[in-house]
Regions:
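C-terminal ends and interior cores of transmembrane alpha-helices
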Residues: 5-20, 210-222
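Hydrophobic core of transmembrane alpha-helices in multi-pass small-molecule transporters
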Residues: 23-38, 226-240
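Helix-loop-helix hairpin linking two adjacent transmembrane segments in secondary transporters
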Residues: 23-25, 53, 62-109
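Cytoplasmic helix-loop-helix junction between adjacent transmembrane helices
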Residues: 30-65
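C-terminal membrane-cytosol helix-exit motif in multi-pass small-molecule transporters
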Residues: 98-118, 306-311
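Juxtamembrane intracellular "pre-TM" segments in multi-pass secondary transporters
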Residues: 113-141, 325-329
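Short amphipathic helix-loop junctions that connect adjacent transmembrane helices
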Residues: 156-176
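Helix-to-loop junctions at the C-terminal end of transmembrane segments
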Residues: 186-200, 284
Length: 329
């Protein structure tokens, strides 16, 4: 509720900043909107916390399904409402965002979650160094960071590349981003089942391959079809890497440790996304679309190295490439 209130304030002030042409207020407003994003990312952990052990993986995946609806509604509203207020392009879009925040509040008012018990509040915790040095935690965080880093880099630069470098229309860019978001969240219908059956490591590898294919298509051409198909693959690759990483993280902490572990995980993952988003604009405007895609490759390289290290360290112990087993690392 607190995060939603901050987000609503940010959306309202963003609309005002556009109307009055105040760039610094706009930056502050978007910062507030981003705070809501930080709160909203905890929904997946909340779902995992209340799910049974067997259902945790699917719970995380199912939370992501809401993004499919958002993938169609968000870009459509942004496009249709951007000229709602004369001489203030996109101010109307931000006013519509306030309506979404009201809907969030109404849903949260009807949601009942168990309060933290004594085990969570007073249970024994391990030293932070011991928690964060677990191989499973390290590989989970690095995989999610890589997936988000590539996604943020390429996705953020796409509208600029399409409209400025490739001379496509804004409507084309909105169409591509719309389907990218669908690619991000549509796999949620089956990602959880795949992870439950095969384990997270093979699914992370699949996500990496999808990202590599995305980059290859982007380097091959700049038609709308290239952008459209590559951004769908980018979204799917992100989903596989992010959901699998989250699944691995929730296996690395006790109830008393979950707050700090979840917080550190999200700080690292979304910190990477923030840095990638900033770099995307700089690289795109100074070096171009090809450089954006080539700059994404090191993220995937880090994830591959981390996974091979984890496999060689734990393959015999956990049977990583077999059907998923209940184990800890």
């Amino acid at each position: 509720m607190i995060g939603t209130g901050i987000g609503a304030f940010g959306a309202a002030s963003a609309a005002g900043s556009i109307i009055y042409s105040n760039f610094y207020l706009f930056c502050l407003s978007i910062f507030c909107v981003g705070i809501l994003g930080g709160f909203a990312q905890l929904y997946r952990f909340a779902a995992a916390d209340v799910a049974t052990h067997e259902f945790k993986t699917k719970a995380v995946s199912l939370v992501m399904i809401g993004g499919i609806i958002a993938g169609f509604i968000g870009p459509t509203v942004a496009s249709k409402a951007k000229d709602l207020i004369p001489n203030a392009e996109f101010a109307g879009s931000y006013l519509f965002v306030i309506i979404f925040h009201v809907l969030i509040v109404l849903i949260l008012l009807k949601t009942r979650l168990p309060r933290p018990d004594d085990t969570e509040q007073k249970g024994k915790t391990r030293p932070l160094k011991e928690i964060f040095s677990q191989p499973k935690f390290l590989v989970a965080v690095l995989s999610a960071m890589a997936g988000y880093g590539v996604m943020a880099m390429v996705m953020t630069a796409t509208p600029l590349a399409m409209t400025e470098e490739s001379s496509h229309q804004f409507s084309d860019a909105a169409f591509v981003i719309q389907w990218h978001v669908v690619g991000m969240f549509a796999p949620a219908f089956f990602t959880g089942s795949l992870i439950h059956r095969y384990g997270p490591v093979p699914i992370i590898f699949t996500g990496i391959l999808l990202n590599v294919l995305c980059i290859a298509i982007n380097l091959a051409g700049t038609d709308v079809f290239n952008y459209w198909s590559s951004l769908i693959l980018l979204g799917m690759g992100w989903n596989f890497m992010f959901v699998s990483g989250t699944t691995m993280v929730i296996e690395t902490y006790s109830p008393a440790e979950k707050a700090i572990v979840q917080g550190v995980n999200d700080f690292l993952v979304f910190g990477t996304a923030a840095v990638s988003s900033l770099l995307a604009g700089v690289v795109q405007t100074s070096l171009g679309w090809r450089a954006v895609n080539l700059s994404s490759i090191p993220f995937l390289g880090v994830a591959v190295l981390a996974l091979f290290w984890y496999i060689f360290r734990n393959a015999e112990k956990e049977g990583i490439f077999l059907v998923k087993q209940d184990s800890t690392a």
